Amino acid sequence: MSDPRPNTLSPLATLTPPSSSRTWQTAPHPTLPIVATACSDRSVRVYSLTSFTLLHSITGGHKRSVRAVSWKPHTQGQSVLATGSFDSSAGIWRREEQGGNEDDFTNRRVGGAEDEDGRDDDDEDEYQFSCILDGHESEIKSLSWSPTGQYLATCSRDKSVWIWEELEDDNFETVAVLQEHDGDVKCVAWHPEEDLLASASYDDSVRLYREDSDDWVQVACIAGKEGHGMTVWWVEFEGSGISGKDFRVQRDGLSEEQTQHVDSMERSGPRLATCSDDRTVRIWRRKPRERAENASSNTGIPSIIRSAAIDEDWYQDAILPQVHERAIYSVSWSRTTGLIASAGSDGKIIIYKERWRKQTPNGVDTDNMQIDGSEPASLTEWFVLAELFSAHSVFEINHVTWAKRADKDKRYDGEEVIVSTGDEGEVKVWTLDEVADPPQRDA
């Protein structure tokens, strides 16, 4: 029997004015209560999450639709935005923030000289086009800054993944051109703690890369019978560390197997979420290297998957409940609560939550989640916490993400909202009304 779903997603706002053309993706700023939306009219629209109104319309840098946006982390005194376009180029935009420190910006929405509707009066406060990154032979589908902001990854319909390094004064150097995929590369995402990059593709595979002796190389490939059966649209890593609201954080009362499971997951590091045309959301987990190396040396039998010390083994940790009826375009893993949101072609937004299984398998090796393609023997399970139909009327949802809530009706510090980006040009903001905690495993 499926779990009851008393939790609801309630509409909070539609960002105004909406775009008159298709919107592809919305990226929350890492520190400010604003989001940037990539639009088919060749613009990027920057909205306030305080007033839900348009603050800036960034134009003039691209000749075709803007497909992807990504804010650079850890900037001081300025906001830096990367944009990827169907014109095959990536753009870098900068805005010098007026006001002093990030807390001032947050309290005053985005800082600078603004009138009552949140618009800037001074053209100098607008985003300035800084530089263009050329190299791809076809449209850019996704881009992402590394956790430190040192690298920018881009991917394209030309089947390649590029890694750029910013040197100084808007001078970017190409440090890698990775051509492991056999099809259109849909998405790239960085690990939150390491310079480890994941990519998803039309070739149904997920690939992971890292630097080895000054060269970027593929260290893992998730494909075939262990992977998705159709196009993989999105990849996103779990947040760094275990959230204070995560069900695993309270160790009192856990069984020995559960405690071992938590320890093993901490050794594995953040997991990876993917979604696909095959209508599934899947979670992948890295096999802890210490156990892998010890097992190989103790038996004298090397891993059949790993061909070198730098290679990694990633196993399927879970397939989330299959609720979507058509392709899933986007997943977002909350770094505050550990909840996952998904959205796609069927217009649904689904929220999933992880918990301990009521009955756990006996004798589970928590470091080996899957063997020879068999189903993973996990101690946890995911269930549907909330489900919303027709979130954008009859239109597809191209992207979904979690963001910090910043309006005056915020219910508590750290509250999050869900931001969905639709094919009709609207960006909508939703609250999750969680009225009951799920039942937990008996101690």
Curated annotation (Swiss-Prot):
GO terms for biological process: iron-sulfur cluster assembly. Residues 1-27, 95-124 are annotated as: Disordered. InterPro entries: CIAO1/Cia1, WD40/YVTN_repeat-like_dom_sf, WD40_repeat_dom_sf, WD40_rpt. It comes from the Eukaryota. Keywords: Repeat, WD repeat. GO terms for cellular component: cytosolic [4Fe-4S] assembly targeting complex. Transmembrane segments: none annotated. WD repeats lie at residues 14-57, 61-103, 135-174, 180-219, 221-248, 255-294, 323-362, 391-440. Residues 113-124 have a biased composition (Acidic residues). Pfam families: WD40. The keyword Transferase does not apply. The keyword Secreted does not apply. Residues 8-21 have a biased composition (Low complexity). HAMAP family: ciao1. Belongs to the WD repeat CIA1 family. Essential component of the cytosolic iron-sulfur (Fe/S) protein assembly machinery. Required for the maturation of extramitochondrial Fe/S proteins. This is Probable cytosolic iron-sulfur protein assembly protein 1. The lineage of its organism: Eukaryota, Fungi, Dikarya, Ascomycota, Pezizomycotina. The gene is CIA1.
